[in-house]
């Protein structure tokens, strides 16, 4: 009998052949959980594209949610700042709503959702607007789009901050609000949030 621990160890060590061998014997492991998450979650957060392809090809659930945060693999990838993996999973059909698309920097999807959905651009999810999430995760192009579609930079987040204050906090603390992001992505995040602060001041001086 194959132990799930062996399976997850193989996934996390990027042992493609071993994972393929294990799944051939016990495909039910695709839905197994380790610390509340599936193998696809771990492959996504590790930016292991080959492993993700293998798992999806074997039938892994692209939109499975972890037990702790109710996040899908694309959400895990975003938390780690794995932008390429976010796009990779999105292109393969990962479910993404307006707030998530703003946080993930999926400009084309944000544009489509704003154009075709009836959900207000300033709607809240967990106390956050799409505009605030775009600022938090450093996506200037998404911020500009949402501002042009009526995004309100003066709405306050769960910590009482405006969108400008969110961007400035990310710059001041070097991305402390997104602690899991890799160092190289964090440097980019700080630069992007600085650009977002400039955009907000230019478009909405009272922000």
What are these regions (language model features)?
Residues 9-15, 42-48, 76-82, 100-106, ...:
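Ankyrin repeat A-helix N-terminal signature
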Residues 18, 50-51, 84-85, 109, ...:
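Conserved ankyrin/ankyrin-like repeat signature
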Residues 28, 98-99, 103-109, 113-119, ...:
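Alpha-helical protein-protein interaction modules
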